[in-house]
Amino acid sequence: GNAVMMNYYSALDRGNEAIEDGVNLRLPSGSALPWGNRDYDVNLVVADKAWDANGQLWFNPFNTDGFLGDQILVNWQYEPRLKVRARSYRFRILNGSVSRYFRIALVREIAGNGGEFPGPSGSGVSYSRVPFHLIGNDGNLMEHAVPFDGSMDLDGDGDKQNHNAILPTQGIAERFDIIVNFAKNGIKTGDKLYFVNLMEHKTGKGPEKNGLSLADVLSEKYKAVIKQGSKGPEWDKGDPVVGKFMQMIVQPYTGQDVSMNPADYEPAKPGKAAGKKMIPLTLDRDNAADMVKVKAARHREFIFGRSDGTDEAPWTIKTDGGFGYDMDSRRISAAAQLST
């Protein structure tokens, strides 16, 4: 749906940032049309692809270990470049791959060595992180706009920097909506920014356990190369889909950016109380009575399994610790009931 639909809703997400009625969140979009403006609301379908020796798209439908391409496309464009104006944008990033996971970062290129991370040896450039806010996911808008700026320990591991300008791992068909302001954080007209993939795959069965570091990828300490193998050219020393995959070039903006400031909707963090809510949750995690309801609710566990052999049940689902069954449309393992 993200690739073909407008994804606009009648109240909160109007697609017109100028409407100030106390309901519309005024997300970056534009204001020329009554609703559904897309000037500053951009869909990005990110996917890996492969081509054969004749330049034709190639795919192996019999590969049950997960298909991996060796090139990354955005909206079916190779090495895309997007001119952006010096203002806020909303990017709806969808993982359109068959088997590949992504871990996407945003950086700005800086002439010389004044950036946080050095570029490749002899390149004459360095890079700095570009903070942004995560405002939505597969379930559409979230309760708060989460800052990816190093101000919060987002995964509770004690390290605030591992999500500074770096999104969480993004699974197949998973969507992240972010707001980037191209007029803040030292960004100037003419600057070049890049989306960077930090997630390595060695097989299609799943990504490597830990994502790669921005320092290693931007310096090209980690960089796949082509070598001649027994069957012809092949990739060596890494995953070719790791690295920069989309460039944005900042253009001047003479208009007035009237879209919302996501910082006003941030969750509570050290030294700052919680801001406004975009979508109030049905259950309040700070309400003891609501948490009692959650504990009293019935919890189910589904475990999806796969065998490495060629037995009669290569794909199975276990329900609540039971047996692993293969697909049978006549069997009901979990029948949800209202208010349970």
Q: What would you call each of these model-derived segments?
A:
Residues 1-18:
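Hydrophobic or amphipathic alpha-helical targeting/insertion segments
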Residues 80-82, 278-284, 337:
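OB-fold nucleic-acid-binding modules
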Residues 262-304:
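Extracellular/periplasmic ectodomains of large secreted or surface enzymes and adhesion receptors
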Residues 287-340:
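C-terminal substrate/ligand-recognition segments
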Residues 37-38, 45-276:
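Histidine- and aromatic-rich segments of cupredoxin/plastocyanin-like copper-binding domains
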Residues 16-21, 37-39:
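Core domains of carbohydrate- and sulfate-ester-processing enzymes
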Residues 21-27, 31-35:
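Gly/Pro-rich turn-and-neighbor structural signature
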Residues 7, 43-45:
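Beta-strand segments within the central parallel beta-sheet cores of soluble alpha/beta enzyme folds
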